[in-house]
From Swiss-Prot:
Compartment(s): Cytoplasmic vesicle, Clathrin-coated vesicle membrane; Golgi apparatus
Protein's UniProt keywords contain Hydrolase: no
Organism from which the protein derives: Homo sapiens (Human)
Biased composition (Acidic residues): 678-696, 705-726, 778-791
Family to which the UniProt record says this protein belongs: Belongs to the adaptor complexes large subunit family.
GO CC annotations, alphabetized: AP-3 adaptor complex; axon cytoplasm; clathrin adaptor complex; clathrin-coated vesicle membrane; early endosome; Golgi apparatus; lysosomal membrane; membrane
Keywords, comma-separated and alphabetical: Albinism, Cytoplasmic vesicle, Disease variant, Golgi apparatus, Hermansky-Pudlak syndrome, Membrane, Phosphoprotein, Protein transport, Transport
Region of interest (Disordered), residue spans: 1-31, 268-292, 662-811
Changes after translation: Phosphorylated on serine residues. Pyrophosphorylation by 5-diphosphoinositol pentakisphosphate (5-IP7) impairs interaction with KIF3A. Serine pyrophosphorylation is achieved by Mg(2+)-dependent, but enzyme independent transfer of a beta-phosphate from a inositol pyrophosphate to a pre-phosphorylated serine residue.
Name this protein carries in UniProt: AP-3 complex subunit beta-1
Membrane topology designation: Peripheral membrane protein
Record: disease: Hermansky-Pudlak syndrome 2: A form of Hermansky-Pudlak syndrome, a genetically heterogeneous autosomal recessive disorder characterized by oculocutaneous albinism, bleeding due to platelet storage pool deficiency, and lysosomal storage defects. This syndrome results from defects of diverse cytoplasmic organelles including melanosomes, platelet dense granules and lysosomes. Ceroid storage in the lungs is associated with pulmonary fibrosis, a common cause of premature death in individuals with HPS.
Subunit note: Adaptor protein complex 3 (AP-3) is a heterotetramer composed of two large adaptins (delta-type subunit AP3D1 and beta-type subunit AP3B1 or AP3B2), a medium adaptin (mu-type subunit AP3M1 or AP3M2) and a small adaptin (sigma-type subunit APS1 or AP3S2). AP-3 associates with the BLOC-1 complex. Interacts with KIF3A; interaction is direct; interaction is impaired by pyrophosphorylation of AP3B1.
Alphabetical GO biological process terms: anterograde axonal transport; anterograde synaptic vesicle transport; antigen processing and presentation, exogenous lipid antigen via MHC class Ib; blood coagulation; cell morphogenesis; clathrin-coated vesicle cargo loading, AP-3-mediated; establishment of protein localization to mitochondrial membrane involved in mitochondrial fission; granulocyte differentiation
Length: 1094
């Protein structure tokens, strides 16, 4: 074989080694076939001879065969002396393979490896980067304390190597040296600090791993490199991403305040709506002050989001745990889709992902409810996957989906996998405990399972029924009698013990059956399982105390049998019971209370998820999987009450930028920044910090100069950002002035558009919009003042026009007022059009034009029909005389433009006054908000009152659960909106309708064919039926056979376009176009039967 036949590449060495090993087997001498009977003395002798040969081709062939043996898992350690002699070979291919071998066996053959240490040291200076890296790997694999100084020196030199591959191996060597000699920690930290500043993506993951192993508590080393790591994250290799994300998760928990308080505080602030002006002002101030996300916090969340699409399951899981632990709860929902995608992987990945989903679904059900069907069990799933899916389905069960889940569970009970069937029965029991509405249904189903042929199913059903009956023992005497009959057929000890315990607890309710059961059990006492024997003793004791005449002798007989039982637990229990229930001279005071002790009411067992207590472990870790703290686990710290100084993450700025700034500039910027809303500061500053490391550093440095601003990091104004870019553009020279300005303004516009998009996402209030309009004025003023005197007169006039136009436009923005009746008029909401990068003056002139001249206008209109149908909120029987009904008035909600208005009518059907009617505890899905009505002091007998509420359903038909309370009672009530009430009617032209419909195609379009009598397809009938189901507006149509309706969703403002196209005969096609595909599908299902019926 020639030396060029198998070129060895370090990157793919493992795969080639395997192939070489396969070829090697064919060249072994025939005697190797009888290796079982031959002597081991001459084993591998041919390889040793080839390694000692003078020919490089023979040596290379031998090394390939040896590496092939290693790849197959065979022991090649006896060849170490022969291999190590070739470490100084001049052939680069041989040297690479020798180092691969030495890395594997240097730790086992330390003495022989030490003989060649001088060769390794020389190799550290080799021109080939692979040889330098391999030499360092071998050197760090020789775990002998005597060479620690040599290793330390080699690591320091390698950390400054020009090759990032060598620096990467230096980071790997740090961990090995630290485990060999922990006393080198301080010197190694210096190397880690140096490598953390490395800008190569190849080094980042390895050095962070070294940091986690050596000094995970040295958070100060991360400060200056935090933004760089966030920006490099997407380009780092996959396994490095995992390590970095876990480290940054811990870092964020120590450096930023909790983002989870925001929603709670806003919800609390919304409770007291009608208050005095002073109180309202205090509430508004509170709403603004509590929490603003740090731009660096936002940077981390935004830069990890793309990694949810990674092909590596570990990366996706790492990002998911980061979002779970440090992102606002409203943003954590995006991880659910990615985690569900991982369920298509192999079973090992599924197991870990399902465990993490099980933990998440306990705290935030809403995240995974849309993907309920993804957790249905498949026949091909292994048992461990099936039980985890059952756990998740149980956690996601609620009143809305329990009927579907119970049908699914019925199928699972019939499974051939008995362990899975038993787990399903346990799940049904938990559902019955958690959802009281289906407790009786589940109990009846479990009783039916008692007649199942499979004994394991019957036994598990008995155990679960016993737990359910403890919740309501007085109501189910018949079930207890039925279970008593099963004692003759059931042999599973746990089930027999459960039946005996139930009979003993309810012996007074079944006085005739209990003694007979005890008689039967006395006959078979000696052959029963220990668990059953204990319950027989308990049953005898309880009957002795309640029915002594019939069972006294029987109990004494059982106690005598227990006295001589082989199990010491049985004997101990027998002595205890005898002393307690059979009075004698030696009996103490306890015997007086024997009845209270044995027949005391026991609390019902609490059926909880086994994943309930795992949330204190970081998701995705070994500790979370095992539910025990593993070696090396680093706990997540609690959020700090006050955020540490954010300036520690600022990188030093270059001196040039400081010198160029004109005098007085900083003052103007400071005064302008006072007008900025907090949400704008957060979004824009985080945007600019993500552009590049140098930009984030320089901008942070400028902020550090100002000294007066603590928390704000960067400028948030679109005009000031374009101004800064244009000023930096002028430095390049007068001839490039115009070009640089044009580019900088275009960039400023795109940045501002990004900022606006993020502001929409963060749902900024109207007050922040007012502030942003004042920012525009102030920033345009500062820009016009900073223009140099050399600018032309026409430019100055243009600036004045722009300023005047903006000032004219500013008063149009106004605060929302409760008494402002104009809010009920149709609100004009123009369709957003893409903004080209125009000059500021032209932009100002265009913005000053009236939008009414545009042909593309979509505005909210008044409802075409208001249904009078009411829904029962609280029945008078359930409400102890208080009845409540609600309906949807289809008018704009005065409590918020994203809320659906609801009117509730309360009736007092009693002959007494009902006092203090108010809303109590709210159990709303994630993201949903509710504005409650003011408490009603009293409601007279036969009196009635109507109140208004607002609920933001987040464009979903999820149920809003809350408590309607009086002075004495609280009642659980639910409001589930019809999908048609989540819409606002809009007025638009046929042209605009077709244009929008052309955009919303593909997955955004759902359709169905309707069959009905011709008289049901007249325009008036179609109109009446559609507006009765949904709050939509009619769109003028130029064709008689096509009827169009349009609306937008209340929460997000997404268009909902409905088309009814009449076909030949008695058929029609119903088409719905919308981005909200779920709502569109539900609306289609509701409209189809209404349009079909006569």
């Amino acid at each position: 074989m020639s030396s060029n036949s198998f070129p060895y590449n370090e990157q793919s060495g493992g795969g080639e080694a395997t192939e070489l090993g396969q070829e090697a087997t064919s060249t072994i001498s025939p005697s190797g076939a009888f290796g079982l009977f031959s002597s081991d003395l001459k084993k591998n002798e041919d390889l040793k001879q080839m390694l000692e040969s003078n020919k490089d081709s023979a040596k290379l062939d031998a090394m390939k065969r040896i590496v092939g043996m290693i790849a197959k898992g065979k022991n090649a350690s006896e060849l170490f002396p022969a291999v190590v002699k070739n470490v100084a070979s001049k052939n680069i291919e041989i040297k690479k393979l020798v180092y691969v071998y030495l890395v594997r066996y240097a730790e086992e053959q330390q003495d022989l490896a030490l003989l060649s240490i001088s060769t390794f040291q020389r190799a550290l200076k080799d021109p080939n980067q692979l040889i330098r890296a391999s030499a360092l790997r071998v050197l760090s694999s020789i775990r002998v304390p005597i060479i620690v100084p040599i290793m330390m020196l080699a690591i320091k030199e390698a950390s400054a190597d020009l090759s990032p591959y060598v620096r990467k191996n230096a980071a790997h060597a740090i961990q090995k040296l630290y485990s060999l000699d922990p006393e080198q920690k301080e010197m190694l930290i210096e190397v880690i600090e140096k490598l953390l500043k490395d800008k190569s993506t190849l080094v980042a993951g390895s050095v962070v791993m070294a940091f986690e192993e050596v000094c995970p508590d040295r958070i100060d080393l991360i400060h200056k490199n935090y933004r760089k790591l966030c920006n490099l994250l997407v380009d780092v290799e996959e396994w490095g991403q995992v390590v970095i994300i876990h480290m940054l998760t811990r870092y964020a928990r120590t450096q930023f305040v909790s983002p989870w308080k925001e929603g709670d505080e806003l919800e609390d602030n919304g409770k007291n709506f009608y208050e005095s002006d002073d109180d309202q002002k205090e509430k508004t101030d509170k709403k603004k002050k509590p929490y603003t996300m740090d731009p660096d916090h936002r940077l981390l969340i935004r830069n990890t989001k793309p990694l949810l699409q990674s092909r590596n399951a570990a990366v996706v899981m790492a990002v998911a745990q980061l979002y779970w632990h440090i992102s606002p709860k409203s943003e954590a929902g995006i991880i659910s889709k990615s985690l569900v995608r991982l369920l298509r992987s192999n079973r090992e990945v599924q197991y870990i992902v399902l465990q993490n989903i099980a933990t998440m679904s306990i705290q935030r059900k809403g995240m995974f409810e849309p993907y309920l069907k993804s957790f249905y069990v498949r026949s091909t799933d292994p048992t461990m996957i099936k039980t985890l899916k059952l756990e998740i389905l149980t956690n996601l069960a609620n009143e809305a989906n329990i009927s579907t889940l119970l049908r699914e569970f019925q199928t699972y009970v019939k499974s051939q996998d008995k362990q899975f069937a038993a787990a399903t029965i346990q799940t049904i029991g938990r559902c019955a405990t958690n959802i009281l509405e289906v407790t009786d249904t589940c109990l009846n189903g479990l009783v039916c399972l008692l007649s199942n042929r499979d004994e394991i199913v019957v036994a598990e059903s008995v155990v679960v029924i016993k737990k359910l009956l403890q919740m309501q023992p007085a109501q189910h005497g018949e079930i207890i009698k039925h279970m008593a009959k099963l004692l003759d057929s059931i042999t599973v000890p746990v089930a027999r013990a459960s039946i005996l315990w139930l009979i003993g607890e309810n012996c007074e309710r079944v006085p005739k059956i209990a003694p007979d059961v005890l008689r039967k059990m006395a006959k078979s006492f000696t052959s029963e399982d220990d668990l059953v024997k204990l319950q027989i003793l308990n049953l005898g004791a309880k009957l002795y105390l309640t029915n002594s005449k019939q069972t006294k002798l029987l109990t004494q007989y059982i106690l005598n049998l227990g006295k001589y039982d082989q199990n010491y637990d049985i004997r101990d229990r027998t002595r205890f019971i005898r002393q307690l229930i059979v009075p004698n001279v030696k009996s103490g005071a306890l015997s007086k209370y024997a009845k209270k002790i044995f027949l005391a009411q026991k609390p019902a067992p609490l059926l909880e998820s086994p994943f309930k207590d795992r949330d204190h472990f970081q998701l995705g870790t070994l500790s979370h999987t095992l539910n025990i703290k593993a070696t090396g686990y680093l706990e997540l710290s609690n959020w700090p009450e006050v955020a540490p100084d954010p300036s520690v993450r600022n990188v030093e700025v270059i001196e040039l930028a400081k010198e160029w700034t004109p005098a007085g500039k900083a003052k103007q910027e400071n005064s302008a920044k006072k007008f900025y809303s907090e949400s704008e500061e957060e979004e824009d500053s985080s945007d600019s910090s993500s552009d590049s490391e140098s930009e984030s550093g320089s901008e942070s440095g400028e902020q550090g100069e100002s000294g007066e601003e603590g928390d704000s990091n960067e400028d948030s104004s679109e005009d000031s950002s374009s101004e800064q870019d244009s000023e930096s553009g002028r430095e390049s020279g007068l001839e490039n002035k115009r070009t640089a300005k044009r580019n900088s303004k275009a960039k400023g516009k795109s940045d501002s558009e990004d900022g606006e998009k993020e502001n929409e996402k963060s749902k900024t209030s109207d007050s922040s919009n007012d502030e942003s309009s004042s920012i525009e004025d102030s920033s345009s003023d500062s820009e016009s003042e900073s223009e140099p005197e050399s600018e032309s007169e026409s430019r100055r006039v243009t600036k004045e026009k722009e300023k005047k136009t903006k000032q004219d436009r500013t008063p149009l923005t106004k605060d929302v007022s409760l008494l402002d009746l104009d809010d009920f008029n149709p609100v004009s909401t123009p369709v957003a059009l893409p903004t080209p990068a125009l000059s500021p003056s032209l932009m100002a002139d265009l913005e000053g034009l009236h939008l009414s001249t545009s042909s593309s206008v979509i505005s909210v209109s008044t409802p075409a029909f208001v249904p009078t149908k009411t829904h029962v909120l609280l029945h008078r029987m359930s409400g102890k005389g208080l009845a409540a009904h609600y309906f949807f008035p289809r008018q704009p909600c005065i409590f918020g433009d994203k809320m659906v208005s609801i009117q509730i009518t309360l009736n007092n059907t009693t002959d007494r006054k009902i006092e203090n009617i108010h809303i109590g505890e709210k159990k709303l899905p994630i993201g949903m908000k509710m504005h409650v009505f003011n408490p009603i002091d009293s409601l007279e007998p036969e009196g009635s009152i109507t109140v208004s509420m607002g609920i933001d359903f987040c464009d979903s038909t999820q149920t809003a659960s809350f408590q309607l309370c009086t002075k004495d009672d609280c009642f659980n009530v639910n409001i589930q909106p019809p999908v048609g009430e989540l819409l606002l009617p809009v007025a638009m032209s046929e042209k605009d309708f077709k244009k929008e419909q052309g955009v919303l195609t593909g997955m955004n379009e759902t359709s169905a064919v309707i069959i009905a009598a011709p008289q049901n397809f007249t325009p008036s009938v179609i109109f009446q039926k559609v507006v009765n189901v949904a709050n939509v507006g009619a769109v003028p149509s130029g064709q008689d056979n096509i009827h169009r309706f349009a609306a937008k969703t209340v929460h997000s403002g997404s268009l909902m376009l409905v088309t009814v196209e009449l076909k030949e005969g008695s058929t029609a096609q119903l088409i719905i176009n919308t981005e909200k595909t779920v709502i569109g599908s539900v609306l289609l299902r509701e409209l189809k039967p209404v349009l079909s019926q006569g």
